[in-house]
Design a protein with these regions (language model features):
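Surface-exposed loop/turn elements that mediate protein-protein interactions on large endomembrane-trafficking
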Residues: 1-4, 36-53, 86-98
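Core segments of small alpha/beta cavity-forming domains
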Residues: 7-11, 19-27, 33-35
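A short, structured loop/turn motif at beta-sheet edges
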Residues: 17-19, 41-48, 62-64
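Residue-level signature of beta-propeller blades and closely related beta-rich strand-turn architectures
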Residues: 29-30, 142
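Short, solvent-exposed loop/turn segments at conserved positions within beta-propeller repeat blades
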Residues: 30-35, 77-81
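Acidic, small-residue rich beta-repeat scaffolds with periodic aromatic anchors
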Residues: 60-189
Length: 189
């Protein structure tokens, strides 16, 4: 039995055939525009909810072996949504990568952040410090190790580590809103 107690409405229901197995993928919207995706397996024993994933489908691929782009809430340094590709493996939605690529605003534009105080980081050439007035453009985030990826306006790639803390659910770590113990709002605008 599939209960959608927390759902305000259903955005879409999709039939997925993969390696002879039939699934139904349901995308819902919950409170505060928060999304949830349910993967239901259909077989001779009936209908079984096998996997859930926070987020919204970006699109449904014609070939499910290509994976499903899912945009999830990722709130790190002023970003809001991040995209990962998930595959159906062993009856579960599984991401092959831990990195969320930032989605930007509806037009795809990524925000620029201006540095207010010195921030240690790593650029293509090695370790360095961003100085007040420098601008970075968020690109991606890995919640597994707290690496925040960015580019400078000239296209130079860089990254910095954000602080992680337990979020209270299953021992997972989440962004604490600080970098090196300093509140993000003191470091960036």
């Amino acid at each position: 039995e599939l209960k959608l107690d927390e759902s305000l409405y259903v955005n879409g229901v999709y039939e997925v055939s993969l390696d002879g197995q039939e699934y139904v993928m349901t995308e819902t919207t919950t409170f505060d525009d928060y999304g949830m995706i349910y993967l239901v397996k259909l077989d001779e024993s009936g209908v079984t909810l096998v996997s859930t994933q926070d987020g919204h489908l970006r699109e449904v691929p014609a070939d499910p072996t290509e994976g499903f782009e899912i945009e999830s809430k990722v709130d790190v340094l002023g970003t809001y949504g991040g995209i990962r590709t998930y595959f159906i493996q062993d009856d579960k939605l599984t991401a092959n990568d831990t990195i969320y690529e930032f989605a930007g605003d509806p037009s795809g534009e990524l925000p620029e952040l201006t540095v207010k105080e010195s921030v240690n980081c790593r650029l293509e050439g090695g370790n360095t410090t961003l100085k007040a007035g420098d601008v970075i453009i968020p690109q991606a985030y890995s919640p597994d190790d707290g690496t925040f990826y960015f580019e400078l306006p000239d296209g130079t790639a860089g990254n910095l580590l954000v602080d992680l803390s337990p979020d209270g659910s299953e021992g997972q770590m989440t962004y604490s809103g600080t970098i090196g113990g300093v509140d993000e709002n003191e470091l960036f605008e």
